[in-house]
């Protein structure tokens, strides 16, 4: 809804971070964003893997990577004291961008020389028909056999946009342990993993995102996450056993040791 309203809106100004964050990345000097963005009309928005791409006039983009929270606020709303970028529109509404752990706020004209962004543009989306069983098989064939299931799915952006957050339910639905090595997978398990990638991400998207995340207006998504920091203390919804939380490959993993045995 906000995106449709903003089609006729023009950026009035942009303001640099009130709270500098060493793990917030920009394209060039963020002090130059004002000259690049001011006066540009908002045209559209699109999602590519882990990126949200805001398209303005004159081929100007604002590409936001995973980890950047974007919130649309109407005219008169209070401006938060801490942010990494703020953009105001000519109707006095504004967009505020914040980063908790890490993220990129990239304002640029024409193209962005970033391998993850370019990969997200060029690789098939798991939500699309181009991401089929044959394509998935090629990804598996190109991966080192000693990679774990988590490393295969959620590192190096083999599958654009698939990160640690959505990984948990994908592996649970496939009944695969996050530490299990790809070399141990049989055909049936690879089929289950492919099916879980497609169906789980489609369900999350159709429901407006996970309930552990918030949308442009601050509302949580409608997809009820099975495995997360909010649910791991609950019993497994399938077998009733205890769930496990572990630190693994730079983030937490959640799994059921009974339903997802380590083979």
Locations of the language-model features?
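A common structural microfeature
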Residues: 6, 42, 49-51, 61, ...
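Basic, nucleic-acid-binding surfaces and adjacent catalytic neighborhoods in DNA/RNA-processing proteins
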Residues: 14-33, 38, 43-46, 51, ...
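Glycine-rich, N-terminal phosphate-binding loop and its surrounding beta-alpha-beta segment
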Residues: 47-55, 60, 66-68
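Generic recognition of long tandem-repeat/solenoid scaffolds
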Residues: 52-56, 87-88, 254
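Phosphate/anion-contacting hairpin/loop surfaces
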Residues: 62-162, 166-173
């Amino acid at each position: 809804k906000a995106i449709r309203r903003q089609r006729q809106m023009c950026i009035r100004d942009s303001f640099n971070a009130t709270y500098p964050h060493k793990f917030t990345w920009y394209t060039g000097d963020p002090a130059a964003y004002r000259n690049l963005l001011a006066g540009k009309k908002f045209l559209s928005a699109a999602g590519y893997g882990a990126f949200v791409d805001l398209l303005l006039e004159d081929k100007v983009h604002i590409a936001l990577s995973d980890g950047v929270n974007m919130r649309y606020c109407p005219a008169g709303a209070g401006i938060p004291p801490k942010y990494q970028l703020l953009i105001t529109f000519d109707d006095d509404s504004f967009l505020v961008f914040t980063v908790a752990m890490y993220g990129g706020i990239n304002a640029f004209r024409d193209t962005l020389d970033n391998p993850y962004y370019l990969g997200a543009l060029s690789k098939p989306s798991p939500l699309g028909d181009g991401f089929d069983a044959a394509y998935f098989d090629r990804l598996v064939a190109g991966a080192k056999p000693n990679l774990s299931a988590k490393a295969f799915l959620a590192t190096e952006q083999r599958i654009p946009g698939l990160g640690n957050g959505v990984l948990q339910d994908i592996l649970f639905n496939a009944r695969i342990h996050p530490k299990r090595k790809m070399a141990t997978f049989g055909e049936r398990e690879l089929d289950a993993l492919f099916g879980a990638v497609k169906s789980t991400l489609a369900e999350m998207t159709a429901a407006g995102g996970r309930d552990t995340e918030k949308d442009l207006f601050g509302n949580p998504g409608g997809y009820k996450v099975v495995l997360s920091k909010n649910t791991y203390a609950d019993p497994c919804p399938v077998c009733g056993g205890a769930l496990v939380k572990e630190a693994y490959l730079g983030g937490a993993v959640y799994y059921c040791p009974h339903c997802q045995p380590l083979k």
